[in-house]
Amino acid sequence: MRLPAQLLGLLMLWIPGSSADIVMTQTPLSLSVTPGQPASISCKSSQSLLHSDGKTYLYWYLQKPGQSPQLLIYEVSSRFSGVPDRFSGSGSGTDFTLKISRVEAEDVGVYYCMQGIHLP
């Protein structure tokens, strides 16, 4: 498992003057969900995140109030240790989705998608 060394920015990683400029765009920017209902967040990359090693380096993090970001999903769809199975990731190339099958109160926070294919 390849984990990024650092989390850079909220929705965007930008390397000025580089041919590897990648813009990550999440939608929606905010979401109100009733507990027990499903939720979905989309993430679009300006470039394919498929690496020559065959893996796609897309990560999802959750930052709960007053806490550091915690890894939920790595390589598009693999749940990190201890992450409940109500969280799932899908997608390929440039389009990705994080789904929560049944939202719980503890799921409140800021969700981030992050690419790990081009790091400074």
UniProtKB/Swiss-Prot annotation:
<keyword id="KW-1064">Adaptive immunity</keyword>
<feature type="region of interest" description="Framework-3">
    <location>
        <begin position="82"/>
        <end position="113"/>
    </location>
</feature>
<dbReference type="InterPro" id="IPR007110">
    <property type="entry name" value="Ig-like_dom"/>
</dbReference>
<feature type="region of interest" description="Complementarity-determining-3">
    <location>
        <begin position="114"/>
        <end position="120"/>
    </location>
</feature>
<feature type="region of interest" description="Framework-1">
    <location>
        <begin position="21"/>
        <end position="43"/>
    </location>
</feature>
<dbReference type="InterPro" id="IPR013106">
    <property type="entry name" value="Ig_V-set"/>
</dbReference>
<dbReference type="GO" id="GO:0019814">
    <property type="term" value="C:immunoglobulin complex"/>
</dbReference>
<keyword id="KW-1280">Immunoglobulin</keyword>
<dbReference type="GO" id="GO:0005886">
    <property type="term" value="C:plasma membrane"/>
</dbReference>
<dbReference type="InterPro" id="IPR050150">
    <property type="entry name" value="IgV_Light_Chain"/>
</dbReference>
<keyword id="KW-1003">Cell membrane</keyword>
<feature type="signal peptide">
    <location>
        <begin position="1"/>
        <end position="20"/>
    </location>
</feature>
<keyword id="KW-0964">Secreted</keyword>
<dbReference type="GO" id="GO:0005576">
    <property type="term" value="C:extracellular region"/>
</dbReference>
<feature type="region of interest" description="Complementarity-determining-2">
    <location>
        <begin position="75"/>
        <end position="81"/>
    </location>
</feature>
<keyword id="KW-1015">Disulfide bond</keyword>
<feature type="domain" description="Ig-like">
    <location>
        <begin position="21"/>
        <end position="120"/>
    </location>
</feature>
<dbReference type="Pfam" id="PF07686">
    <property type="entry name" value="V-set"/>
</dbReference>
<dbReference type="InterPro" id="IPR036179">
    <property type="entry name" value="Ig-like_dom_sf"/>
</dbReference>
<feature type="region of interest" description="Complementarity-determining-1">
    <location>
        <begin position="44"/>
        <end position="59"/>
    </location>
</feature>
<protein>
    <recommendedName>
        <fullName>Immunoglobulin kappa variable 2-29</fullName>
    </recommendedName>
</protein>
<keyword id="KW-0391">Immunity</keyword>
<dbReference type="InterPro" id="IPR013783">
    <property type="entry name" value="Ig-like_fold"/>
</dbReference>
<keyword id="KW-0393">Immunoglobulin domain</keyword>
<dbReference type="GO" id="GO:0002250">
    <property type="term" value="P:adaptive immune response"/>
</dbReference>
<comment type="subunit">
    <text>Immunoglobulins are composed of two identical heavy chains and two identical light chains; disulfide-linked.</text>
</comment>
<keyword id="KW-0472">Membrane</keyword>
<feature type="disulfide bond">
    <location>
        <begin position="43"/>
        <end position="113"/>
    </location>
</feature>
<feature type="region of interest" description="Framework-2">
    <location>
        <begin position="60"/>
        <end position="74"/>
    </location>
</feature>
<dbReference type="GO" id="GO:0006955">
    <property type="term" value="P:immune response"/>
</dbReference>
<comment type="function">
    <text>V region of the variable domain of immunoglobulin light chains that participates in the antigen recognition. Immunoglobulins, also known as antibodies, are membrane-bound or secreted glycoproteins produced by B lymphocytes. In the recognition phase of humoral immunity, the membrane-bound immunoglobulins serve as receptors which, upon binding of a specific antigen, trigger the clonal expansion and differentiation of B lymphocytes into immunoglobulins-secreting plasma cells.</text>
</comment>
<keyword id="KW-0732">Signal</keyword>
